């Protein structure tokens, strides 16, 4: 397969279509920053996929529960090892994503002889001061983005943009306003 690059590209394209189909029934995850902290919210009919990872890190996800659990456990272990070996202040969302989870997800996606992770992740990092919160979204192919005031995971990029556009129009300061805007 590696001798024929066009087949590899075709296989990667097929994986994208397959994974896009897997997220169509998923419940969106919304992360919004407010004056008292960060809200992660989902309206899942099943088990909510929201977790605490470390002191100032939380995780929200969409996808297959087993894949999310494996990625959550890897993040949890990585954060605690980093905090123990270095310093708790070294455990940041950016560090966990850039040097830990994103390369692993990317490798699983591009290794065509193995199953990819059926997961999208939103990592929220509570800032040391109000207004310094960060969100990182990781797609099923390992690509990630850093955002500041809010972030959304959903079935498609169009839905995410629509939800972000709605959140931009809201005046959000208190937790009550955040919950109202997120619902």
Q: What feature does the model see in each segment?
A:
Residues 1-183:
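Long, low-complexity N-terminal extensions
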């Amino acid at each position: 397969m590696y001798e024929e690059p066009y087949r590899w590209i075709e296989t990667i394209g097929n994986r994208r279509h397959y994974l896009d189909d897997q997220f169509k029934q998923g419940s969106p995850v919304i992360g919004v920053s407010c004056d008292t902290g960060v809200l992660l919210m989902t309206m899942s009919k099943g088990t909510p996929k929201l977790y605490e990872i470390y002191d100032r890190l939380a995780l929200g996800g969409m996808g297959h529960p087993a894949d999310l659990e494996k990625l959550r456990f890897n993040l949890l272990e990585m954060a605690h090892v980093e905090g123990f070996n270095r310093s708790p202040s070294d455990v940041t969302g950016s560090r966990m994503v850039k040097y830990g989870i994103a390369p692993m997800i990317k490798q699983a996606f591009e290794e065509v002889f193995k199953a990819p992770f059926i997961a999208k992740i939103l990592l929220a990092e509570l800032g040391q001061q109000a207004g310094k919160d960060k969100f990182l979204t990781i797609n099923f192919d390992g690509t990630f983005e850093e955002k500041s005031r809010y972030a959304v995971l959903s079935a498609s990029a169009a839905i995410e943009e629509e939800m972000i556009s709605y959140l931009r129009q809201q005046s959000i300061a208190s937790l009550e306003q955040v919950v109202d805007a997120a619902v």
